[in-house]
Amino acid sequence: MALLQIAEPGLSAAPHQHRLAVGIDLGTTNSLVATVRSGAATVLPDEHGYHLLPSVVRYTEDGATEVGYAARAHQSDDPHNTVVSVKRFMGRGLSDLADAAATPYRFVDAPGMVRLVTRQGEKSPVEVSADILRALKARAESSLGGELTGAVITVPAYFDDAQRQATKDAARLAGLNVLRLLNEPTAAAIAYGLDNAAEGTYVVYDLGGGTFDVSILRLTRGVFEVLATSGDSALGGDDFDHRIYCWLLEKAGLSQLPDGDIRRLLTLARAAKEHLTDNTSARINTVLSDRQVIDLELSRDELAAITRTLVDKTLLPVRRALRDARISVDDVKGVVLVGGATRMPQVRRAVGDFFKRPPLTNLDPDQVVAIGAAMQANVLAGNKGEDDWLLLDVTPLSLGLETMGGLVEKIIPRNSTIPTARAQEFTTFKDGQTAMAVHVLQGERELVSDCRSLARFELRGIPPMVAGAARIRVTFQVDADGLLSVAAREQSSGVEASITIKPSYGLTDDQITQMLTDSLAHVKDDIAARKLREAVVDAESLIATTDAALKSDGDLLAPSELQAIDNAVAALRSAIAAQQTVAINAATARLNDATNDFASRRMDRNIRRALAGQKISDL
């Protein structure tokens, strides 16, 4: 699968020229940039030797922008202008932020996503993320000594279209050419799979600063296939910090605190959590703004106790992903840990107990995603040799269209590998129909009312035909970044309409989970409802066809035959009103039987009309 490079004659790149491409892990808590040098992926440090760049941006009084450690140092004393964990706000409206009141930020609900009020004016999450990406770009170009060809940027597997598009917009604002967006767990699989030549079924358990993702991957020689994904976009190391913060408040008998004190205690909570990775106890000592002294000791066992529910919460998506992939714990060959929060002993212990084996930790969990992204960037830039590998991601929910009767026709099933394109033909419902409304839906239920509406558009200019004669081909295409395009084309005339779906607001992981749970809980009811709707649609179509035939050719019938058909139509209308599937199907069959001879006579008449005035020799 080596990429072909095409250039103007005489201008092709020299065989030895190495294009500068990087992989960027745009994280909630920390971000990194990596590249491939001499065949090995490496994370690029800053001028002080630090590999991690805190994902923190501060807007100063003199109009400057601080990113990283310098900004993080002011979390406590300048909380309104120091933006932390901006990734949680990407592609999100104010109504999507359940914990908005718990943050020190002043939000403005704007179209598309929230904006944050700072001393330098309102800033969108895209602009804040662009400042982080700009700093990483500068670090890479300084370290590599040249301009970047492009970057592969990682995102959580559960990022929706709006969040992915926001990430692309941030990169564009930072002057980066996005080669591809890559799911974080998949990037980790690339790093582990290539370094260790791993084969088999693996679980990637990614617990970062603000998001949790789990992916089930089948790794075979040269092929990465994601069998299933799940996760929680509002669960990560920040939540563990908050549990320690709440423990501090309880132990110290505190309630309401100024923003500066909240930031100070959260910073100390994070430091204590990290200290307990390698130590059995951590002391938390500080003086609050009201001169109250905090001096407490937190043990590793106490930390495990107060965060046990958070660790257990990560195992719910793990079970869901295993079920979706149709595998058991015994089928898993190994577990890859990703994200700084997986350093916590209680997390590693819980994961090991669940999967009955110690997790893999031979790569730095903070760096593994950036390393995998760098490897992918190296391929897309054309630097990789012929020993390329294939990467397949999956769609988290089914995608489909509304059909007559309020039914959903699934075009791309859930957990389909992407990129993918699938097409299906539809037709018109009424005679002379010249337009068709295309309603794109997402979800697992059978009825439109139970699924999520993504977009609507119309296909106009369909040539007038009898019902069922037109052929409209609808194509769904999901690109490598998970963005959906839908096109509808009438085959005989070539008229076409399309839409690229970038929803203003996306689904949360909890909503996705609820949709999957509902589909399982209501599967019998949904099947019954679908059968009823299909029976009604078929019945109403038959009634409409019969009425039209009676108006044009009713003279072909004897009074008794006409009465029999009228009675059958009336019986079918009554069955439809009663909403009983069996009765509707039986009444439909009776009307079909009653009109069989009538249909034959109509066909004979139409043939005679078509042949009138023609000689056999002309045929």
UniProtKB/Swiss-Prot annotation:
Gene3D superfamilies: 1.20.1270.10, 3.30.420.40, Actin, Chain A, domain 4 (3.90.640.10), Substrate Binding Domain Of DNAk, Chain A, domain 1 (2.60.34.10). Coiled coil: none annotated. GO terms for biological process: iron-sulfur cluster assembly. Keywords: ATP-binding, Chaperone, Nucleotide-binding. One of its GO terms (molecular function) is ATP-dependent protein folding chaperone. The keyword Chaperone applies. It holds the Pfam family HSP70. Signal peptide: none annotated. InterPro entries: ATPase_NBD, Heat_shock_70_CS, HscA_NBD, HSP70_C_sf, HSP70_peptide-bd_sf, Hsp_70_fam, ISC_FeS_clus_asmbl_HscA. It comes from the Bacteria. NCBIfam families: HscA, PRK05183.1. Belongs to the heat shock protein 70 family. Chaperone involved in the maturation of iron-sulfur cluster-containing proteins. Has a low intrinsic ATPase activity which is markedly stimulated by HscB. This is Chaperone protein HscA homolog. The gene is hscA.
